């Protein structure tokens, strides 16, 4: 085995990809490899609180990561400098270190995270459809949607849903062969099988399962041989009515250098996306996390965190954990001020303001003395129609809203009306100095 410091650094690099930045920096960044005794890797941590937290919440992730890197079943223990020496540990190996055989066809349920179930998944507007589709697949594998393709940004719940499907299937059919793995692990195992001249063992392993859950499929891009292998694996499973669930950070058509025949197969079933959670969902996520971990968090702190962290669930939960850890370490009660202090390193001092269509209507209405309801009315008088066109133009320029959504906010107007307004104002700006001045004033008020 390689030098344990190099091994631990590799493990940290992989773990950093899988958890939120605040969680990584709070619990793992300051850790180092101490020693290796038998099949137990001893990690040095800064204090007792970190030791308890790592051992209770990250053991499974760390040990799985070490296995992915080494192929050996290593256990971890934590030690605190000048607090406990390695000799004081009970270091009897829990099992003899051994390499996993790639041809192994039994897939331990430990590959599934026990915390990722449908019961622990918080449903919101951004994930409702993906949740419903995942539940339908779990209830009737290969009969509802096959394949199910879930895409969305990092930390939004794709992996949670995949694990939840696996748990549900096993709960209702304990003898089912359910496999969860990343496309990177699929690639590495395939390469090892080719190297060791055991391609048939690899094929038998993944073509004889009931449910295949494969995460981050976008990493197959550019890997021609692996794509070829996965293509045939996909075909075999699909023809035998076995369920396939795939996740990605983007839809199939946007994955570069993905073979067309794979892309088309990904589109055979149902494609659903997950978008970032809205404020209400973020608060619900924090409440559920706090309850699960036994944290007593005031509502004002929940609201503060939810308002500050709007990127993804992983960052959101990581921020909550950071606040709790900070409170424990300095022995102070959790409140909004403490939360602000704990999160000052990960929250920008001045977040850019998110401008909404309602903001635009309000400011444009004030500038031109137009009532808000007039923007949605059928009035076509110039005193109303022109400000409405300006508001539509700004909505197109300053928000991420679609044309139909903008039209809906202006009294249910057709998207072609929005296009016409945008084109008209865009043309006028080129020559109308007065309009340029008005738009500048409006935008300054908005920002």
Curated annotation (Swiss-Prot):
A GO molecular-function descriptor: DNA replication origin binding
For region Domain IV, binds dsDNA, the annotated ranges are 328-447
Stretch list, region Domain I, interacts with DnaA modulators: 1-72
From the UniProt entry, list the residue stretches annotated as the region Disordered: 86-107
Membrane spanning residue stretches:
none
Positions of region (Domain II): 72-110
One GO term of the biological process aspect? regulation of DNA replication
| Location(s), subcellular | Cytoplasm
User: Member of which family?
Assistant: Belongs to the DnaA family.
Q: What does this protein do?
A: Plays an essential role in the initiation and regulation of chromosomal replication. ATP-DnaA binds to the origin of replication (oriC) to initiate formation of the DNA replication initiation complex once per cell cycle. Binds the DnaA box (a 9 base pair repeat at the origin) and separates the double-stranded (ds)DNA. Forms a right-handed helical filament on oriC DNA; dsDNA binds to the exterior of the filament while single-stranded (ss)DNA is stabiized in the filament's interior.
Q: How does it assemble?
A: Oligomerizes as a right-handed, spiral filament on DNA at oriC.
User: What is this protein called in UniProt?
Assistant: Chromosomal replication initiator protein DnaA
Organism, as annotated: Anoxybacillus flavithermus (strain DSM 21510 / WK1)
Question: From which lineage does this chain's organism come?
Answer: Bacteria, Bacillati, Bacillota, Bacilli, Bacillales
